[in-house]
A protein has these predicted regions:
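A detector for short metal-coordination/catalytic motifs
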Residues: 263-264, 269-291
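N-terminal secretory signal peptides and thylakoid transit peptides that target proteins
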Residues: 5-29
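Short linker/helix segments within small regulatory modules
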Residues: 253-262
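N-terminal pre-ligand scaffold of iron-sulfur
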Residues: 35, 39-240, 244-252, 291
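N-terminal intrinsically disordered, acidic low-complexity segments at the extreme N-terminus
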Residues: 1-2
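Short alpha-helical basic/polar micro-motif
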Residues: 16, 239, 265
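Eukaryotic short linear interaction motifs
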Residues: 28, 211, 244-245, 274-276
Length: 291
């Protein structure tokens, strides 16, 4: 990257925008129901599902990425293991055919329709893990090469992530950015016995905990979603950059400070940045699953 590229993402947006993101999410901007219908009619493609899709995401705050990365709602079982929730599978009519779709309306009373279409971009729509009725346990599992020393010391590849291992989440730091914002891990979801890996990132954070418990200046709609989709301060998302599909990371490199904030999620491919503590709605065209 040339020195001129640094001018694209001014440094003064760093700490200020991070603080702004901590205290508030945003609402879906500028596209109403009529617009969504128009998009749907103009982008029909062969295959199952797809089209205009609203998803909750961590906010894209800098760089060329067009939108945030979609959240994965999570639950914690009785033993502390973290599970990504998969929507209910149903049959729908599409183009005269009956196809299966994983979709849950009014997810946990949040008013949100949670759908597998949130993840149908960057080729993920063709992954085995996006098969609606795939038999899998849905646990979030540690990946092969974690970026964090604590995770390397705790897990082998394929081990299920456990909330009890994130016990330093109020103080953890690794020299990048501010300590005490949360304790992270990387992993996979719905990817066992598959040639394609769905990468995920998890952070257990006192900031998310505060937002779920009524703190912070966010909308009621945003808070309901955070309460429904996070657990014990832990948040997860599909870790596929919405620009060119690379795998970003939180507190994995000092380069994040140059292009926005060391407290943001940074994609090393083209310097897109995401604020994991600013939860927003996005609208995009989900790609259809292959027939």
């Amino acid at each position: 990257m040339s020195a001129d590229d640094s001018d694209k993402y001014p440094e003064d947006s760093g700490r200020r925008r991070f603080v702004k993101g901590v205290v508030g999410g945003a609402t879906l901007a500028g596209v109403g129901a009529a617009g969504a219908a128009t998009i749907n009619s103009a982008t029909s493609s062969p295959g199952a599902g797809g089209g205009a899709t609203q998803a909750w995401a961590i906010e894209n705050v800098a760089g060329p990425a067009p939108r945030g990365m979609p959240m994965i709602p999570i639950e914690i079982d009785g033993d502390g293991f973290i599970k990504g929730v998969w929507p209910d599978v149903k049959e729908v009519k599409q183009g005269g055919l009956t196809v299966k779709l994983a979709e849950t309306e009014n997810y946990k009373g949040s008013g949100v329709t949670y759908s597998q279409e949130w993840y149908q971009y960057c080729g993920v729509e063709s992954y085995k893990g996006l098969q609606p009725d795939l038999e899998t346990d849905n646990y979030l599992r540690s990946d092969a090469s974690p970026a964090y020393q604590w995770q390397k010391d705790t897990y082998e590849e394929g081990d299920k992530l456990n909330i009890n291992d994130f016990d330093q989440y109020k103080t953890w730091g690794n020299g990048f950015g501010d300590p005490g914002l949360g304790q992270p891990a990387t992993g996979t979801w719905r990817s066992q016995n598959s040639d394609n890996t769905m990468p995920i990132q998890v952070i257990r954070s006192p900031i998310i905990e505060k937002l779920a418990n009524g703190g912070g200046d966010i909308s009621d709609q945003t808070r309901k979603w955070i309460q429904a989709a996070t657990a014990k301060g832990a948040i997860a998302w599909l870790d596929k950059c919405t620009h060119f599909c690379c795998v970003p990371g939180w507190k994995q490199t000092s380069a994040a400070a140059k292009f926005g904030s060391p407290n943001w999620v940074y994609c090393p491919c083209h310097q897109s940045m995401y604020n994991p503590f600013s939860i927003v709605q996005t609208l995009f065209i989900a790609r259809p699953r292959p027939d």
